[in-house]
Every structure is written in C-alpha cells, then in structure tokens.
Amino acid sequence: SVGFKAGVKDYKLTYYTPDYETKDTDILAAFRVTPQPGVPPEEAGAAVAAESSTGTWTTVWTXXXTSLDRYKGRCYHIEPVAGEENQYIAYVAXXLDLFEEGSVTNMFTSIVGNVFGFKALRALRLEDLRIPPDYVKTFQGPPHGIQVERDKLNKYGRPLLGCTIKPKLGLSAKNYGRAVYECLRGGLDFTKDDENVNSQPFMRWRDRFLFCAEAIYKAQAETGEIKGHYLNATAGTCEEMIKRAVFARELGVPIVMHDYLTGGFTANTSLAHYCRDNGLLLHIHRAMHAVIDRQKNHGIHFRVLAKALRMSGGDHIHSGTVVGKLEGEREITLGFVDLLRDDFIEKDRSRGIYFTQDWVSLPGVLPVASGGIHVWHMPALTEIFGDDSVLQFGGGTLGHPWGNAPGXVANRVALEACVQARNEGRDLAREGNEIIRKACKWSPELAAACEVWKEIKFEFEAMDTL
C-alpha cells in the first residue's frame, strides 16, 4: 500500500536522523531532554524535532502535499548528560525556511512554542542555539553597538559606571531627578530607572523624563563629561512605548531603557529600530528572566535569551555579576558575555557554549554587572569583565554614609585605581584589596565606603589559570 496510511506512528521513524549532515544555513538547537520513564531518548528527541517543525501527532493528508524532507526538523545527535540519570542532550536541526526573517518572536514560537508541554517529556530545557549567518543577516541587531557607544559618550579604556536609583518606587519626580544629579555629579556615567518604574501614580513618566533630563544637563555642565540616565520607556502598549522614546529624543538625552522579556520581543525590536533611526542608545533589563532560566532541567538557558536580545536589539543587557559565586558559574557567565560582545565565538562545552557562533559583524552588546556589588568588588569586576562592560552599583552608591554624590565618587575612584593598576601590569586577582586600600589614602569618600562594606574575600583565582 503505497498510498496514505492513517494512524499514529513513532516520531523517531521520521524525525530521528543520526546520519544527517548539518547545513551552514540550519538553525541548530541543543535541548536538555528528560524523558518520562519508559520513553526511549531517540523518541523524545525526535518528538522535540517534530513538534518544533512539521510534526503533528497523527499522519495527515496534507503531509502528502508538503516536501517533508525539506522542511522537517531533524534530531541528528543524542548524548547522555554526564552525572545525570535519564537526561540527554538532543541536537535538533531546523531548516532556515521554517523561520520568518528578522523575527525573534517567530523563531521562539517555532523552536520552543509548543513542545515544552509535551507529555512524553518530564522536562525540557533549551541550552543553546546556533544562529546561522544567513539568518543573523536578516536582523538589525543592537541600535549602535559598543564602539559607536564609546564614540557617542567619549569614554574609552575603562568599564562604564552606573547606578539604579533606589528606593525603586515611591520617590516624586523632583526628588528622583535630584538623586540622578547627585550620582552623575559625583562621577558615574549613567544612572538607571528601576525595571518596574514605568508610569505610576506617584511619578508619571513625563515628569520623570523632564527632571532626569535637567539632572543630566546640569551634571554634564559641571563635570565636562557626557552623562546619561536610562529612561525606562517600557509601557502597556507598543504605541505608548514609542511615544516615550520620542519624548526622550526630543529632550536630547542619550539613552532609553526597555524590559525586553516582559515587554516582549516584538516591542523590543520596534524600539531598537526606532533607537537606531534616532540616535538613542538602548539599555535592556532582563526582568522575568529567572522565571524562564533558573531551573537546571526545564526552561531556556539565559545564553539563548542573550543571543535573542543581540538579534532583537539592545546596547546594554544585564548579565549577572559572577563575583562571589561558584567558579563554574563564572565560566558560564563569561561564555554568554563573550556571545554578547564578540564577533565569533568557538564552541566550548566547559563554558556552556554548545555551538560555534558567527555573528558576521552584528554590533555587540555591553554586559551589565548589577546587583549586590560594592567598591571592594571593583578589582574582581575589572578583571572578569574587562573594559567593555557597565558596572552598576545601586545600594553600593546610594548606601554611602555621606550621601549619593560621595557614593559615586567612591566608585569612580575605585574604578580608576583598578584600571590604572591593571594597565601598570599589576595582578588584580591577588592585589585587589591592597589597590583599593591604597586609593583610600587620597579619597576620603572611598575610605568611608570601604569602612561600611568591609573587605570581602575574593573567591577567585587569576584569569590566566584557566
């Protein structure tokens, strides 16, 4: 019977193809699959490939009218995960034609849209994606990228400094602007709206934008440096978001901000296009990421969300701090930090990078280290992240016993001391505390900050021991 054979059949007959040679144009995905008891890994891997491409649960007539061979996803390799029982990495190749050009939204809908609720799987995690150059080229990417940002700001040879204004909710616009001014005046490059500051009853967005712009211009005039404040343009509708970005541009400020996961990729890409067309930098916050990436066996790893952001567009993105965490976590964080900044990243499983990624001159994104860091961390941060990064100290600035401006001074002095020491060839990993202590001698602001937060034990070795 050559004709149509109705009924349910195993996915692996069609979608498990271990001898498939991947093409340069394929989008490759690495899934961590935990099958239900009794489900063979090949069937589970094939189910993932089917469900993210042409598959459905039963044989259908219209399959006869489709070139399955051309359009089906293929599970081309499966390997057990070392040290985990009944867990596998399934590699899936999906043909380029399955995706709409320039749409991160469509890419995610296709690759992770349905399959995560699949009954045959106990859990599923998307660990990495290989975006082929042909697909990368359909995206605009970051509005400006690292080099253009440095030129706009006229700041070179060091990481940039930021500060999230706290308390995140409850300040009036005028008091908020005052805190912004003090931090910038003290020596920071940027201040930041908190991710949940949008436009609430106690502070409407337009008032905030106005007072922050005033703070920026006053600080610029007094310091002779270019300053910025990440004005959060995230809103309930795309139209409102663009309206806020337009107002920011009219005020002449350098940068706006967006929560790209809660706002959604479609909104984010629209905003990124607007920002490039109008010379605004775009700072991206990853609110909601832990909902998606925190579980080890289910969800989507942050490195995939980071790649997606580079395609959708953003000039900065929050990417963890590394400091004081475990060594392995450090390697993995540095892996996706490189994916954000570099043009070409080699496959390296020890850093969680499953595929070689070629970004073909898509602009890079500055990683932002933010959360629970203070002056004693500065040598470690300078060592780990290097020059192309933004270091953000919220409480580490506003918590200074003498006030906001001295808080900013302490951070700037600590940073300049670390950068100078590094440039002189000193070993920040070993001499970090000493470098900070020495700088305290000529900066009372730094000395006061060091007193409050005390020395921390550096739980890290020099970079070159890897």
Swiss-Prot record:
It is found in: Plastid, Chloroplast. The modification N6-carboxylysine is found at residue 192. Keywords: Calvin cycle, Carbon dioxide fixation, Chloroplast, Disulfide bond, Lyase, Magnesium, Metal-binding, Methylation, Monooxygenase, Oxidoreductase, Photorespiration, Photosynthesis, Plastid. Binds 1 Mg(2+) ion per subunit. One of its GO terms (biological process) is reductive pentose-phosphate cycle. Signal peptide: none annotated. One of its GO terms (molecular function) is monooxygenase activity. It catalyses: 2 (2R)-3-phosphoglycerate + 2 H(+) = D-ribulose 1,5-bisphosphate + CO2 + H2O; D-ribulose 1,5-bisphosphate + O2 = 2-phosphoglycolate + (2R)-3-phosphoglycerate + 2 H(+). Its main location: plastid. The active site is at 166 (proton acceptor), 285 (proton acceptor). The record marks 325 as: Transition state stabilizer. SUPFAM superfamilies: RuBisCo, C-terminal domain, RuBisCO, large subunit, small (N-terminal) domain. The modification N6,N6,N6-trimethyllysine is found at residue 5. It comes from the Eukaryota. InterPro entries: RuBisCO, RuBisCo_large_chain_AS, RuBisCO_lsu_C, RuBisCO_lsu_C_sf, RuBisCO_lsu_fd_N, RuBisCO_lsu_N_sf, RuBisCO_lsuI. Substrate binds at residues 114, 164, 168, 286, 318, 370. Its EC number is 4.1.1.39. Its cofactor is Mg(2+). GO terms for cellular component: chloroplast. The basic functional RuBisCO is composed of a large chain homodimer in a 'head-to-tail' conformation. In form I RuBisCO this homodimer is arranged in a barrel-like tetramer with the small subunits forming a tetrameric 'cap' on each end of the 'barrel'. Belongs to the RuBisCO large chain family. Type I subfamily. HAMAP family: RuBisCO_L_type1. RuBisCO catalyzes two reactions: the carboxylation of D-ribulose 1,5-bisphosphate, the primary event in carbon dioxide fixation, as well as the oxidative fragmentation of the pentose substrate in the photorespiration process. Both reactions occur simultaneously and in competition at the same active site. Heterohexadecamer of 8 large chains and 8 small chains; disulfide-linked. The disulfide link is formed within the large subunit homodimers. NCBIfam families: PRK04208.1. This is Ribulose bisphosphate carboxylase large chain. The gene is rbcL.
